[in-house]
Amino acid sequence: VDLMAELLDDLRAETASLERLLEPLPDADWELPTPAAGWAVRDQVSHLAWFDEAATRAVTDPDGFTAGLPGVTSVDDLARQARGMPPPELLGWFRAARGRSMEVFAGLDARDRVPWFGPPMSAASFVTARLMETWAHGQDVADALGVAREPTDRLRHVATIGYRARPYGFAVRGLPQPAEPVRVELVMPGGDVWTAGPADAASIVRGPMLDFCLAVTQRIHLSDTGLELVGEPARAWMEIAQAFAGPPGEGRPPRSS
């Protein structure tokens, strides 16, 4: 299977997993608070829908997308603007925006360049980023509803972008990136071991892929993970790891607090 087809299949599956959480919800549950400060379930969904529309624009009209970047307000403002929308309409918006973006993604070659809010990306990385966002915001929704989702091997896409974004976590905070390489050795939900980085690196991040993915998307405090960090460069990275574009995220407090 070629890379783009695999990514699109997995993005479709990740989307369906979120839709299954949302479909049975009574309207009141769309207002439940999620672990993201100030965001209800509805805000997680409007966020995805808005950025799906932006993703379609980035692919179909890259110049127009780039020209509009300076006018984009904060994600909190975008969430506020959509708060008057009734839940059935909001779910419809998400479905339509996601469906349209999937259609335009299907016409891309893995190596095509797509502009975005951070640096431009290859089409493969771009679709991977949408999957990562869908999974991470879906996690917030699941947490709000008290649902434990079964992790899948689709997490390898989130892990890939999390690993590649190592320089970004430092750059976005104006910090120098340690020169030493870091290796990642993660156990996938299906039991296989997934690795990235030089085999002889002295600094290593080891543990469950789920924990790594929660950490790089800032959905968990590092102290609440089962990750083993070998070497200072590994710890320095994981303390600020950020797989998503935008300003430094606030992360999550330790569960014990």
Predicted ranges, named:
Residues 201-257:
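C-terminal interaction segments
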Residues 8-11, 41, 91-94, 127-130:
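Hydrophobic packing residues in well-ordered alpha-helices of helical domains and bundles
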Residues 175-214:
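Glycine/small-residue-rich hydrophobic helix-like segments
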Residues 14-17, 21, 51, 97-100, ...:
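Amphipathic, well-ordered alpha-helical segments in soluble domains
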Residues 29-71, 116-172, 212:
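Short, contiguous alpha-helical
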Residues 1-6, 53-107, 112, 154-155:
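Short, helix-capping/interhelical loops that line the mouth of catalytic, cofactor-
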Residues 20-23, 106-114, 187-191:
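Acidic-glycine-rich active-site phosphate/pyrophosphate-binding loop
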Residues 1-46:
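An N-terminal domain-cap segment
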